[in-house]
C-alpha cells in the first residue's frame, strides 16, 4: 500500500477542517497517501480512526465539532475516551482536534479557531510521523496553543 496517513472528520462540523488538515499533510508528507473518512458525528470518530489505522496508516488526525448542549459534551467525552483507546491499543498516533461551539459566539471567530486548530495539529501529526516521538520536544513547555494565540512559557 505504501505510506499513508489518515484524516477523519464529521458532517456535524460547521467548518471543513478535514480539507484544511489534508492540505497541510499533502504539503508536509509528500509521497504519503491520504485516507479520508468522513462520518456523521463525533462518536463515530474512534471507529473511523481505527479503520484508517487498520489500513496500515502511520497516524490519523480526527476533527470533531461539539455542540452547545450537555448531550453534545457527553458525546465528546465518550468519543475522547474511544480515541484514547484506539491510540493505546494500536500504538499509533491519533491526534484529536476538537472545536467546542461555545468557544466563541461569532461564527467567524469559530471558523478561525477551527482552521487554526486543524492546521496546527496537522503540522504536529506530520512532524511526529516524519521525525518520530522527539519531534515536538523542542516545543515542550512553550505554551503553544491551537485555535488561539500562544500563551508563552512561564519562567
Swiss-Prot record:
Look at the named UniProt entry and state the broad enzyme category this protein falls under: transferase
Listed A to Z, the keywords are:
Riboflavin biosynthesis, Transferase
Q: Give me the reactions it catalyses.
A: 2 6,7-dimethyl-8-(1-D-ribityl)lumazine + H(+) = 5-amino-6-(D-ribitylamino)uracil + riboflavin
User: Which pathway?
Assistant: Cofactor biosynthesis; riboflavin biosynthesis; riboflavin from 2-hydroxy-3-oxobutyl phosphate and 5-amino-6-(D-ribitylamino)uracil: step 2/2
Q: Which GO terms describe its molecular function?
A: riboflavin synthase activity
Q: Does the keyword Transferase apply?
A: yes
EC annotation? 2.5.1.9
Q: Does the keyword Transferase apply?
A: yes
Known InterPro entries for this protein?
LS/RS, LS/RS_sf, Ribfl_synth_arc
**Pfam families associated with the record:** DMRL_synthase
Which cellular components does GO assign to this protein? riboflavin synthase complex
Coiled-coil ranges per UniProt: none
Any one GO biological process: riboflavin biosynthetic process
Superkingdom field: Archaea
Q: Which family does it belong to?
A: Belongs to the DMRL synthase family.
Return the protein name: Riboflavin synthase
- Organism of this sequence: Aeropyrum pernix (strain ATCC 700893 / DSM 11879 / JCM 9820 / NBRC 100138 / K1)
Amino acid at each position: 500500500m505504501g505510506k499513508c496517513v489518515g484524516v477523519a472528520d464529521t458532517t456535524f462540523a460547521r467548518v471543513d477542517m478535514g480539507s484544511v488538515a489534508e492540505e497541510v499533510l499533502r504539503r508536509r508528507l509528500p509521497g504519503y497517501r491520504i485516507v479520508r473518512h468522513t462520518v456523521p458525528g463525533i462518536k463515530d470518530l474512534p471507529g473511523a480512526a481505527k479503520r484508517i489505522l487498520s489500513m496500515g496508516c502511520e497516524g490519523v488526525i480526527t476533527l470533531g465539532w461539539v455542540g452547545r448542549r450537555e448531550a453534545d459534551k457527553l458525546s465528546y467525552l465518550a468519543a475522547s475516551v474511544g480515541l484514547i483507546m484506539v491510540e493505546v491499543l494500536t500504538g499509533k498516533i491519533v491526534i484529536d482536534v476538537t472545536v467546542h461551539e461555545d468557544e466563541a459566539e461569532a461564527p467567524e471567530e469559530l471558523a478561525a479557531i477551527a482552521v487554526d486548530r486543524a492546521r496546527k495539529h496537522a503540522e504536529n501529526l506530520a512532524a511526529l510521523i516524519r521525525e518520530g516521538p522527539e519531534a515536538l520536544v523542542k516545543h515542550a513547555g512553550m505554551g503553544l496553543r491551537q485555535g488561539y494565540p500562544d500563551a508563552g512559557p512561564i519562567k
